[in-house]
Amino acid sequence: MNDDLPILPPGFGPGSHGEEERPDCPSMPRAMRRFERPALPEPGQLSGHPIALALLERLQEALGAYRIGEQSRVIGLDRQPKADLKLLQQILGEGEVAIQVGGQRPARIQETVLAGVWWVQLQIGRGEVVGQWLEVADVPALVRRRAFAETRWPQLGELPDGLLNAGPVLVELLDAAKRHAERALATPHAVNLSLLPFSPEDRRFLAERLGEGSVTLLSRGYGNCRIASTATPGIWCVQYFNSSDRLILDTLEVTGIPQVACAAQEDIDDSAERLREIREALE
């Protein structure tokens, strides 16, 4: 993946939607991610690039070995020839999910066309790549590690005038989040703001109290789904948009990471088969 690759689409990330499109969330039906084979290079193009082929073989082994719930499988890409990485990037293509991780050492992450195979880049300055790797996982370990690395528990304080439901919603979320912090909840606790009377003041109040986290994820698997961590431990904002970018479902979810962000075991198994087909086509 070269340094100039525009992984994340315009308008992606915290603050990219208006105030009227702030927090909400319930679960959507789970389906396998779609596979669209990228435009593959001609077999002759790979003849002088054995490293690219070797990396594909290692990726095949990682997909065959990985099981959901286990430690992710990582294939380092640092110090590999740029030409081989460019070919690898062409072969793996871009999948449905893009992730942006903020903080002192930001990262950009793109799922490949193989669900559960992620291209991770660490950056400094104006996007200079200082480390990168392929990772086979339901979601990259960096996302879990950094989502709530810098958080705080908000104080309720005195409620401002003009609120309809934000006060009770915040109390409910904080109660669930504290239980989750003590012992991970067996099932996510979700609050669907789309079903509640909510004023602009409600939305501003929740946004200010919960704060803005360091992880933002965009999935094109079900139209557009935008997932963002808040600055409050365990609380995620999950929003669904239609093809016109209109907010159609707005939720807040207490969980380790929303399930819609994660590849399933069937996705991993399917990706192993797809990669096998790709490698055969390149022979």
From Swiss-Prot:
Disulfide bonds: none
One Pfam family matching this protein: HupH_C
Stretch list, region Disordered: 1-29
Gene3D superfamilies, per database record: HupH hydrogenase expression protein, C-terminal domain
Family: Belongs to the HupH/HyaF family.
Protein name, as recorded: Hydrogenase expression/formation protein HoxQ
The gene coding this protein: hoxQ
